[in-house]
């Protein structure tokens, strides 16, 4: 049996302000730093250690991972970063307030944009400075692969090849793996691991900073999964994520 730990980054400054973030590189809030610290402490209390870590190229995920590894006394382990683990790209919604967007377009449409499997928001124009073609960290990636908007289906299409080529291979080699990423890149992976339907993934809420453990068989099929930490806090955190796209 293998164990895999997934962690959504702690609350970011834009999470706090209820803004669509996507590929915008936003730092952790004070609460987010505390969430990452607590996640590290819980993992330490439960006796977890890791051989390799995977993360996106966005600072909120990187900082969450660094805080957790410091708590574990494991800042020395290898960390592999990839844009394929980035948050879903929210297109022209990036920077907009979720509740205000719900007021303008209706909760149903915002929920569809946020959580539907195959309907992306309005795209960014390539001339828009928010488009990733203008970000030097992506200069080695073919322009055709950089999104101007994404639905979850698009996110799955970039996450799963990375899972297969890099992460799954490390697990099969016997390495203990932690992934620090984002709500939608982790939802993409969970959908794949649990073979969830397109409808069921709509209801999945992954809270910030709380370790999610997957126990996998030798073929990397899930045996069970569970969050580490206080059950009431976990429930409240999941409800908070679910309420982000509702009207004020």
Curated annotation (Swiss-Prot):
Pathway: Carbohydrate degradation; glycolysis; pyruvate from D-glyceraldehyde 3-phosphate: step 3/5
A GO molecular-function descriptor: phosphoglycerate mutase activity
Pfam hit, one: His_Phos_1
Active-site residue numbers: 9 (tele-phosphohistidine intermediate), 87 (proton donor/acceptor)
Annotated site (Transition state stabilizer): 182
Gene3D superfamilies in alphabetical order: Phosphoglycerate mutase-like (3.40.50.1240)
CDD domains in UniProt: HP_PGM_like
UniProt-listed GO biological process terms: gluconeogenesis; glycolytic process
PROSITE patterns, A to Z: PG_MUTASE
SMART domains reported in the protein's UniProt record: PGAM
Residues that bind substrate: 8-15, 21-22, 60, 87-90, 98, 114-115, 183-184
UniProt keyword terms in alphabetical order: Gluconeogenesis, Glycolysis, Isomerase
Catalytic activity field: (2R)-2-phosphoglycerate = (2R)-3-phosphoglycerate
EC number(s) per entry: 5.4.2.11
Family: Belongs to the phosphoglycerate mutase family. BPG-dependent PGAM subfamily.
Function: Catalyzes the interconversion of 2-phosphoglycerate and 3-phosphoglycerate.
Protein name in the entry: 2,3-bisphosphoglycerate-dependent phosphoglycerate mutase
């Amino acid at each position: 049996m293998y164990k895999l730990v997934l962690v959504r980054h702690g609350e970011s400054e834009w999470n706090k302000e209820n803004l669509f973030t996507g590929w915008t590189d936003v730092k952790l809030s004070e609460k987010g730093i505390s969430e990452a610290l607590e996640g590290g402490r819980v993992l330490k209390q439960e006796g977890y250690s890791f051989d390799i870590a995977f993360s996106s190229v966005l600072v909120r995920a990187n900082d969450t991972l660094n805080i957790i590894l410091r708590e574990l006394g494991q800042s020395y382990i290898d960390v592999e970063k990839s844009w394929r683990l980035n948050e879903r790209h929210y297109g022209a919604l990036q920077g907009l307030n979720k509740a205000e967007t719900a007021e303008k377009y209706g909760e149903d449409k915002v929920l569809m944009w946020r959580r539907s499997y195959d309907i992306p928001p309005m795209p960014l124009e390539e001339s828009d400075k928010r488009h990733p073609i203008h970000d030097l960290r992506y200069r080695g990636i073919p322009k055709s692969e950089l999104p101007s908007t994404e639905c979850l289906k698009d996110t799955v299409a970039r996450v799963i090849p990375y899972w297969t080529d890099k992460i799954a291979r490390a697990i099969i080699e016997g390495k203990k793996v932690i992934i620090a990423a984002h709500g939608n890149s982790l939802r993409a992976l969970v959908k794949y691991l649990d073979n969830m339907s397109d409808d069921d993934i709509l209801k999945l809420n992954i809270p910030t900073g709380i370790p999610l453990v997957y126990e996998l068989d030798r073929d990397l099929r899930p045996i069970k999964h569970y969050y580490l930490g206080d059950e009431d806090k976990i429930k409240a955190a999941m409800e908070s994520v679910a309420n982000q796209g509702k009207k004020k």
